[in-house]
Amino acid sequence: MPQYLLKRHLRHLKSISVNNISLIDESKKIGSRVGFIPCFIVLEDTRSRKPFYVSELETGSLSSLHFTELVIPKEFELCTLFEIKIAAKIPSFLLRHDEDELWCFVAMHTVNLDELTYIGNQRDDHITMEQNLPMIEMIDGWYALPNKNIRYTGLQISPVANMNNKNRKRMCPFNSLVKLSKLTQYTGDMVEEKQISTNKIERLIKSTHNIGTGILDTYQENIKMIESRCEIKRQKLKRLKDQLSELDDGNELNDVDSNIETYRDEYANIYSKLSNAKEAIEKLQKKKLIQLINVFKNTFLFDKDVGLISFQFDDDEIEVEEFCKNLERVSIEQIYDRYNEYPKSVKIINAMLGFYSLFIVIYSYRIIQRKLPFDIVFQGSETIVGRKYRLSFPESRSTKSKEEFHIALRAFNENIMQFTQYLGHITQSFTI
């Protein structure tokens, strides 16, 4: 069976055979060959330099040791590059009397499965190799390392034997028939799969062609429809031109021009009225805001020590623009600092939060009539924000009360941000 793997991986490895195992370098002609030596092999990752497989001990003819039942870990099954280390036990007669048994690596080979040399479907006993050279069995045949000396030492057939072979009848062993049957079955499977793939591709091509033909027909119908509409428009345009040409002195065109000018004048008047109304509404809103500020000046909301809005007012006028810039969010650190400084000031803190929320509610809902991101229901010192959270500093130190207060304060600060964005459009000062 010929080789059929397009890409070889460790998961295709079946066994490893090591040929001509020797502890002595034969090129130096030193020492003698040892008959039987226990050996094992180690497969090592070339990147991490860590072994991922160690075989069992094998003892036999050193001309060829066969290592089977290779169990490769799953993380290395797709590996194509690894290193084979051949370890052998040094015979006792080569050691000193006081030395324990010793092992050594007789050879180390780096194996790239994509660069192996194909030998055949079966291992040939007439192949001679260099010493300590491995042969690798994949699922599609036997391979050897590249650039290694491999010689075939088959028996020479004499002429007499060759003549006798002519008179012999050709025989077909059972194993050859089995191999031929497997090869025929494999070839038939390949042809069948090829035919199935060809039929699928032909069906896809036909379906794609049909889809393209349908789209082309749709485009052609749309083009015809557009051309017919264009023809209708051309006819209407021609009729309009004929009607215009029938006009005597162009008085009707002058009437059309006068009507256009009239429309422009009316639009300018309406726009001017709307602009004046808008300015009047903005002035009224500013006036209401200043009145609201004057009302809350009687509270401690703007007090620098107790209040939550740090803004200094003059005696005669209020700079609305400066007030808008200084309208700040309530800091949780500010609340806790005041509480730590005056532990009995919980009622004052809640009163300031209530005044601040009442200020936002009156201006948003009554003056500018704008909704806030989170609804505010004023209930004195226990204002409800977002319909479920109380904006009041908790007297109890429980974790749940603190979390609810923090959520309510964050929602209230988002309302202040919405409020200041609208106030940012006010750029003029109003004098009281």
Swiss-Prot record:
Coarse class of the protein's main subcellular location: Golgi
Glycosylated position list: N20
GO cellular component: endosome membrane; Golgi apparatus; phosphatidylinositol 3-kinase complex, class III, type II
Transmembrane segments: 348-365
Residue ranges of coiled coil: 216-287
Statement: the UniProt record of this protein carries the keyword Membrane: yes
Keywords assigned by UniProt, alphabetized: Coiled coil, Endosome, Glycoprotein, Golgi apparatus, Membrane, Transmembrane, Transmembrane helix
Pfam families cross-referenced by the UniProt entry: VPS38
Domain of life: Eukaryota
UniProt note: phenotype after gene disruption: Deletion was unsuccessful, possibly because VPS38 is essential for cell growth.
Keyword Zinc assigned: no
Topological relation to the membrane, as annotated: Single-pass membrane protein
Subcellular location: Golgi apparatus, trans-Golgi network membrane; Endosome membrane
Similarity annotation: Belongs to the VPS38 family.
Job of this protein: Involved in endosome-to-Golgi retrograde transport as part of the VPS34 PI3-kinase complex II. This complex is required for the endosome-to-Golgi retrieval of PEP1 and KEX2, and the recruitment of VPS5 and VPS7, two components of the retromer complex, to endosomal membranes (probably through generating a specific pool of phosphatidylinositol 3-phosphate allowing the recruitment of the retromer complex proteins to the endosome). Mediates the interaction between VPS30 and the VPS34-VPS15 core complex, leading to the recruitment of VPS30 to the membrane.
Subunit structure of this chain's protein: Component of the VPS34 PI3-kinase complex II composed of VPS15, VPS30, VPS34 and VPS38.
Designated name of the protein: Vacuolar protein sorting-associated protein 38
Organism of derivation: Candida glabrata (strain ATCC 2001 / BCRC 20586 / JCM 3761 / NBRC 0622 / NRRL Y-65 / CBS 138) (Yeast)
